[in-house]
Amino acid sequence: MTPIKLIFAALSLFPCSNIYANNITTQKFEAILGATRVIYHLDGNGESLRVKNPQISPILIQSKVMDEGSKDNADFIVTPPLFRLDAKRETDIRIVMVNGLYPKDRESLKTLCVRGIPPKQGDLWANNEKEFVGMKLNVSINTCIKLILRPHNLPKLDINSEGQIEWGIRDGNLVAKNKTPYYFTIVNASFNGKALKTPGTLGPYEQKLYTLPSKISVSGLVKWEIIGDLGESSETKKFNI
């Protein structure tokens, strides 16, 4: 499946003389991550994530763990937090918990963000500076994935297990109820063959609503898939209402 990423763009403007007016381009700089989520085992010593620079120039890689509302989380550090990664090269970053108490009976959720920072004119760390003289606009992409904190007493998620999500109708809306201590990402959901807009991540024992199209039946068949620890999709699940 397509990697699940939250992408934010930061724009960097560069002065450009008339000589290079015809060479103005927009180029994105991002890091390619080796997974769509990281499962952090709270009884472990940290987790690693592969990071690749697909560009033809070096970039800076800046990584951090965030809370809801895009606030920095001091309970986790990423090492190295900022480093140069040469063109077409890849390496690992390490996520380590240094503080914090988290529930032992269910998963918790954070966000891991990795930004690719493009070279600027005058940067001593950048090579081949001439390649960027004619460039007016560089776009720095901040790629964010789920960092799921899993207590040691919870086994690996079995995405094909039955009875994990219960469905119902409430006030004309479809209700999804998570009956497990795991976080679920629901994809390819439909009701009586009509596609449904996924309401984001469904937390442990949480309920969320799907808005149903008007004039739709209040009973029928729900189909959906969930995403596993490695980013794989489950078998198609079914629930009759």
From Swiss-Prot:
Signal peptide range: 1-21
Entry keyword annotation includes Mitochondrion: no
Example GO BP: chaperone-mediated protein folding
Cellular localization per UniProt: Periplasm
Keywords: Chaperone, Disulfide bond, Fimbrium biogenesis, Immunoglobulin domain, Periplasm, Signal
Alphabetical list of InterPro entries matching this protein: Ig-like_fold, PapD-like_sf, Periplasmic_pilus_chap, Pili_assmbl_chap_C_dom_sf, Pili_assmbl_chaperone_bac, Pili_assmbl_chaperone_C, Pili_assmbl_chaperone_CS, Pili_assmbl_chaperone_N
Disulfide bonds: C113-C144
Cellular component terms (Gene Ontology): outer membrane-bounded periplasmic space
Protein's job: This protein is essential for the biogenesis of mature CS3 pili.
Family classification: Belongs to the periplasmic pilus chaperone family.
Name of the molecule in the record: Chaperone protein CS3-1
